[in-house]
Amino acid sequence: MKSLLNAFTKKEVPFREAPAYSNRRRRPPNTLAAPRVLLRSNSDNNLNAGAPEWAVCSAATSHRSLSPQLLQQTPSKPDGATKSLGSYTPGPRSRSPSLNRLGGTAEDGKRTQPHWHVGSPFTPGANKDSLSTFEYPGPRRKLYSAVPGRLFVAVKPYQPQVDGEIPLHRGDRVKVLSIGEGGFWEGSARGHIGWFPAECVEEVQCKPRDSQAETRADRSKKLFRHYTVGSYDSFDAASDCIIEDKTVVLQKKDNEGFGFVLRGAKADTPIEEFTPTPAFPALQYLESVDEGGVAWQAGLRTGDFLIEVNNENVVKVGHRQVVNMIRQGGNHLILKVVTVTRNLDPDDTARKKAPPPPKRAPTTALTLRSKSMTAELEELGLSLVDKASVRKKKDKPEEIVPASKPSRTAENVAIESRVATIKQRPTSRCFPAASDVNSVYERQGIAVMTPTVPGSPKGPFLGLPRGTMRRQKSIDSRIFLSGITEEERQFLAPPMLKFTRSLSMPDTSEDIPPPPQSVPPSPPPPSPTTYNCPRSPTPRVYGTIKPAFNQNPVVAKVPPATRSDTVATMMREKGMFYRRELDRFSLDSEDVYSRSPAPQAAFRTKRGQMPENPYSEVGKIASKAVYVPAKPARRKGVLVKQSNVEDSPEKTCSIPIPTIIVKEPSTSSSGKSSQGSSMEIDPQATEPGQLRPDDSLTVSSPFAAAIAGAVRDREKRLEARRNSPAFLSTDLGDEDVGLGPPAPRMQASKFPEEGGFGDEDETEQPLLPTPGAAPRELENHFLGGGEAGAQGEAGGPLSSTSKAKGPESGPAAPLKSSSPAGPENYVHPLTGRLLDPSSPLALALSARDRAMQESQQGHKGEAPKADLNKPLYIDTKMRPSVESGFPPVTRQNTRGPLRRQETENKYETDLGKDRRADDKKNMLINIVDTAQQKSAGLLMVHTVDVPMAGPPLEEEEDREDGDTKPDHSPSTVPEGVPKTEGALQISAAPEPAVAPGRTIVAAGSVEEAVILPFRIPPPPLASVDLDEDFLFTEPLPPPLEFANSFDIPDDRAASVPALADLVKQKKNDTSQPPTLNSSQPANSTDSKKPAGISNCLPSSFLPPPESFDAVTDSGIEEVDSRSSSDHHLETTSTISTVSSISTLSSEGGESMDTCTVYADGQAFVVDKPPVPPKPKMKPIVHKSNALYQDTLPEEDTDGFVIPPPAPPPPPGSAQAGVAKVIQPRTSKLWGDVPEVKSPILSGPKANVISELNSILQQMNRGKSVKPGEGLELPVGAKSANLAPRSPEVMSTVSGTRSTTVTFTVRPGTSQPITLQSRPPDYESRTSGPRRAPSPVVSPTELSKEILPTPPPPSATAASPSPTLSDVFSLPSQSPAGDLFGLNPAGRSRSPSPSILQQPISNKPFTTKPVHLWTKPDVADWLESLNLGEHKETFMDNEIDGSHLPNLQKEDLIDLGVTRVGHRMNIERALKQLLDR
């Protein structure tokens, strides 16, 4: 002991190395307040560094107690050395402030005698000399408590130089209480406590009794002080330590911890420099012991030092290693501990409560962290879920003791899965912020979802994070330190703060992950509400799928005001809970949550959320879509983690409210795009339809007002998120979803979008007065003030919408005017009967009319950017809004805006390209837009495509420009797509022919963004068969219109070329005249389908894969372009299709989403980006998210459905053509992949597109060879599309389809569908393009598709459903079915891509059961899914068909399918295969 003490006091102190914390101690140079009591020699070092004024005296003085090394290190800063534990109060006792604090008097007597003979270390003379009052002006700073039990005798007399010092007389027994700075020690002599030069005393053997005299508290303090060398400033060092060592065996249960929190020095390797002292015998000690816990019962107490763990010496072992050793022991732990009993002074007791260890928070990061985490969580209101998980990980390993807390809270954990101790804190912590609340719930993994959503099937979602929560619980309990006594707790308070500090780091990181990606952190900052709202957009992406379930609810409960109110309020209130847990995961929960409060607003929000793992959850969603609302909590909690792991896009999505940021381009799209994106993007947008800040002008109704407010709030939040890349990727999807659910709001949004679009993009669209405008207005009214507001731009939006509509519907205006109430005047192309204005077909026709007019009037005139944005927005949103029920419009708008934003984004990134694309797009838009009349936002897609496919655009533009540009202005419709769409639009709008035209549009273009639920099928193939099917149903035409939108030129470049091929080959000669009408008839008869498919699917699909710009332009002019340059169009189309397939397969829906986005315009764009680059494709990402889960699945079904729409009017001729075209398209599509590639490279989404392109190319190589195969797929696609898209499906299943297809809503029957419709639309788009390549469609589907081609006209009415079912062979077999029918289709869609993709190729695998597939079949299948990149791994691992059904996520990851989208695509495709 003496030697230790000597070493301590001598220059060669046990702690020679400067402690890691020295710097810190040095820092407070002149502050006596926080001396590190435990600083020993090392601390001397510190002492110098942070010497108080008095300590500054002389280096010599300060050096007295410093080791030579220390002196060298801090020769001039003696203060550090004299740090005293507490503040020093002058006076006998006050001389040693720390003593006073500790109860120095009591120790005084005890410690007076122990003196250290420090004389040798410091020259008394020097010290004395150096000690001048000035030098030591005030109380010395106590560096650390002296080792208890040492006795010192004064060898030199000393007279106090400064107040607080004590006189020493030779021979006096001095009890050294603490080591201070400047060579001064604090001690008691003759009843006086104060400072004296260390040189004046020498150590003598101390009496054991003295050591023992000190209470354990004193010893602990001393030990801790020594150990921490200044870590524990607040503890006085008791002179005496009673050391008792004992070996205890701890046996705990699995669900509990050992009940102690371990703290200690952190070191990767044993700290050999550490010299155990009686006061600090080991590096690791028990910071806290849960009362009643395992450790407590075994006799362990706070402050015990760990000597051995499982019979291994850990005296010098670092914290992490010790924790790992404890963990390795499992539930059995043998600990040898040393209890250093410190003398307890009254002060000490207080101090003792929070033993120095707690104070050591900085030193012991892990243990400390757990507490600190807890404290921080509480303080910060951060979600404990993340922290808990982190903590659990850390603490569990670090300290099994903490586990004990869990054990104590083990019951709680079992009950709540939450630690009792932490439970409260986390709860309070969580509750403060939405994220916090979510965290708490997440932690619990129970209450959150349930409370959040009354009928919450979201429990499961919470369940996801439950494990995490539990962990957190343990951590929480640990944090709470249930075992800690009240006294200790007090002590813990400071540690808690420190812990908070420590925790904050872990917490933040932990928290952030759970809040998918970085969202949780961001959202919380905004505000629970904000966070929730934005979150909701993210969920909205999920919502895309959700909509299917919520369509009806959404419709009913979409009052804009209510919605926004609900969204904002609910989001804030419930969002907090769900957001984290369910946000990501449970589309349903969010829906439920939203529904109750404001079905629409909530829906939107949910939708955004839903996309998180669209693909993975597609199946789920399909079934749970109905009660999706049950999972409000999902908002953030569960998916957060999942998304990170699985769905970066989705995660982004969940978090993505920021994704909405991606939609930011909506700004450029002004009101409209903003609307569309806003809806998804901003709470306001989400809430109010498209109530972006600009759109928030929905003054007309309370709904509008409420939404406006909500939107603004959300906008702010979203703005905040926009800045976060993660959010960006999700934004589109969310937005889309958000728009979809509240049809009214969406419509408002739509209108504003359209209006905004018109204003911004098509200032020349003052055609508001046109009948088109009137219908829009009607829609606005329909929506109520909300819609008008959403249109927003106050009255402007409405007129804007009309305007946008007007220009677009210039020629179509008459048609429109006939249907101010809706596209009611439009005649069904097939049946010749008047279409319901809200019917998808009518909407599509209206959109097409608008597009035609627009193209005639001023597509060219529109600024490139405006044009892009506007067509996307207007066509997609505007037309669909007017034509389809408001819900459809809403959804379409949503999609449109997404698309449009995407377009804008592209614009900004690829201005040059965009402009060129714009020209092209103008042509395309004129064609497609005319055809679509901005139906269901396909135009939007178009527009988006143009900007997106900058390079492709150039590529295609050159071709298409040659081809399309001529048609562009005179008759965009004449183009392959325009023919179908443009001509059809004009025709359909004015007369029955129009309806067919529309149908054709749907069939040919499947461009009805809204109707897109049918997925603008793969351009040629899907188009052919699906077109027929689509023709069968009324709603098909609208989808066709969307098909126009489908024409997303850039994306269409490839897709349209395929369509063009179809059109060219098929309708090629029918008439791709510039005149819309002539084009339309041709389309309706022959090329309608091809055009529709090409335009819709190819464009839609291609755009996402490539640049949307190029594709979009090509897509719109696709028919013409295709005719002249089928190749180009096909390339786009192929890309689109492949992309969509690829996306589905590779990106789990991102790509698909991209396709889907294209249908909507935005949705399509969104889809694409998510797969490759979330940020890049923000819009797409947003959509992507929505599409991810819902869209993708829906997309398949919808996609399938969509192709049929293209051929509805001219099913017979068109289908035959389509079949041909499909093949060419397929070949071209596949063949054009390279071309597509270029487009893909262009634009902000170049990365995503490139990736998609590569996938497409791979797919193309395999599929292009087999046009038949492509046809095959299209058949499936067509079928799928047909069902959703068929008029009956559209109208009947409007809601249904909505669910499945985003645009289903547009067809308009149900507003709820709008929400879901949108995503489905996107999906359908994606699906369509997928279908075009028809990789997924099974041979049966292929046959079907091909077969239907000839009989489309007759089949149109009857076949749609059957085709869908047959084609899909997926869950969605009822085309006309209900939401679910569509949703199933949509859900199926999710698998559908798989099916589509499977059949896409003529490879053998398409003809045999999965379990009989050989390795090459599996490779071919992957290729068909655009996942050829994984072929080699699958082959290398000898994965054959028998393995596929058993592949788990982990297996896929092991096989290199790390992308959530790819994995989801594979899973979905597998599900489809197995369901077939």
Swiss-Prot record:
Swiss-Prot/TrEMBL domain comment: The PDZ domain is required for interaction with GRID2, PLCB3, SLC9A3 and CFTR.
Sites where a glycan is attached: T1292
SUPFAM superfamilies linked to this entry: PDZ domain-like, SAM/Pointed domain, SH3-domain
Originating gene: Shank2
Record's compositionally biased regions (Pro residues): 512-528, 1202-1212
Subcellular location: Apical cell membrane; Cytoplasm; Synapse; Postsynaptic density
Annotated organism of origin: Mus musculus (Mouse)
Domain annotation SH3: ranges: 147-206
InterPro entries: PDZ, PDZ_6, PDZ_sf, SAM, SAM/pointed_sf, SH3-like_dom_sf, SH3_domain, SHANK
Biased composition (Polar residues): 66-76, 1070-1085, 1307-1317, 1364-1375
Function: Seems to be an adapter protein in the postsynaptic density (PSD) of excitatory synapses that interconnects receptors of the postsynaptic membrane including NMDA-type and metabotropic glutamate receptors, and the actin-based cytoskeleton. May play a role in the structural and functional organization of the dendritic spine and synaptic junction.
A Gene Ontology biological process term: memory
UniProt tissue specificity: Detected in brain (at protein level), where it is highly expressed in Purkinje cells.
Protein name in UniProt: SH3 and multiple ankyrin repeat domains protein 2
Record CDD domains: PDZ_SHANK1_3-like (cd06746), SAM_Shank1_2_3 (cd09506), SH3_Shank2 (cd11983)
Span of domain SAM: 1413-1476
Residues of the PDZ domain: 247-341
